[in-house]
Amino acid sequence: MKNTVLTFKQAKEEKRRLSMLTAYDYSMAKIIDESGVNGILIGDSLGMVIKGEDDTLAVTMDEIIYHTKAVKKGAKNALIVSDMPFLSYHVSIEQAVLNAGRLIKEGGANAVKLEGGANVAAQIKAIVDAQIPVMGHIGLTPQSVNAFGGFKVQGKSESAAKQLIDDAVLIEKAGAFSIVLEGIPEKVAELITNAVSIPTIGIGAGKYCDGQILVYQDMLGMFNDFVPKFVKQYANVGNVMREAISSYVKEVQAGDFPEEKHTFKIDENELKKLY
């Protein structure tokens, strides 16, 4: 059954936890979708895990649209949410609505996500008024990495925590259907979750959120050089892939691949005509 914004609303009302993962291409979207997640985010995290950048700031609208198209073809049941990249909604409300519309019309997304609190409430309202569902995102917002001075946990003081709660309430009033809470103390996330009637989706925000989201490369253990504190690795796919590829290389070098069962035949009479 296709997940929609109503699915998310009903899940909170019925106290059912929501699961989300990122995806950036057809193959992974298909596997993730078949595994039963409620939503797939085409995140601007692709700048880091696909392009190898140090942050998300260089990701463009065209790149998000390209990857959204691919994910759309692989995911039949998950709600497809596309990130609005840095500076795609900051300049003006008109710009925000037009770019959100591109993600829906050109990419095929079901909803868009943008970062910020009170400072983007007007953009959220305008996008929602254009009949485009919006997912909010507060806390450690990666597009603000330079303003934060790095990827640092947010909401650790009373004033900062109160600001996050106020931002969440404003985001709900603006019409968002859910909010991502990233990199904030667990108890602060619980307060936010109880303060709003829309579902909260946590990443590094503890167990009291209405749902969880992770970058799939992190939870599958594809990278060994850095594992965020909030990530649980459910597999070590990186090692499995390296071992498989190493075996392939060795077999090719030794002449053991391809075997006879991997090859195609030609009729002997036809073959003789070639000599």
Curated annotation (Swiss-Prot):
Check the UniProt entry and state the signal peptide residues, or none: none
Positions annotated as active site in the UniProt record: E182
The residues the record assigns to binding Mg(2+) are D44, D83, E115
Which positions in this protein are listed as binding 3-methyl-2-oxobutanoate? D44, S45, D83, K113
Q: How many cofactor units bind, and how? A: Binds 1 Mg(2+) ion per subunit.
> InterPro entries of this UniProt entry?
Pantoate_hydroxy_MeTrfase (IPR003700), Pyrv/PenolPyrv_kinase-like_dom (IPR015813), Pyrv_kinase-like_dom_sf (IPR040442)
UniProt keywords (A-Z) are: Cytoplasm, Magnesium, Metal-binding, Pantothenate biosynthesis, Transferase
* GO BP terms in the entry: pantothenate biosynthetic process
Q: Which Pfam family is one of those matched by this entry?
A: Pantoate_transf
Q: In which pathway does it act?
A: Cofactor biosynthesis; (R)-pantothenate biosynthesis; (R)-pantoate from 3-methyl-2-oxobutanoate: step 1/2
Compartments it resides in = Cytoplasm
UniProt GO MF annotations: 3-methyl-2-oxobutanoate hydroxymethyltransferase activity; magnesium ion binding
Write out the catalysed reaction: 3-methyl-2-oxobutanoate + (6R)-5,10-methylene-5,6,7,8-tetrahydrofolate + H2O = 2-dehydropantoate + (6S)-5,6,7,8-tetrahydrofolate
What's the Enzyme Commission number for this chain? Answer: 2.1.2.11
Its domain of life reads: Bacteria
Q: What cofactor is needed? A: Mg(2+)
Claim: Magnesium is one of the keywords in the record: yes
- Assembly with partners or alone: Homodecamer; pentamer of dimers.
Q: Which PANTHER family match?
A: 3-METHYL-2-OXOBUTANOATE HYDROXYMETHYLTRANSFERASE
HAMAP family the record matches: PanB (MF_00156)
Q: Which family does it belong to?
A: Belongs to the PanB family.
Q: What does this protein do?
A: Catalyzes the reversible reaction in which hydroxymethyl group from 5,10-methylenetetrahydrofolate is transferred onto alpha-ketoisovalerate to form ketopantoate.
User: What's the protein called, per UniProt?
Assistant: 3-methyl-2-oxobutanoate hydroxymethyltransferase
Q: Which organism is it from?
A: Clostridium beijerinckii (strain ATCC 51743 / NCIMB 8052)
Gene coding for it: panB
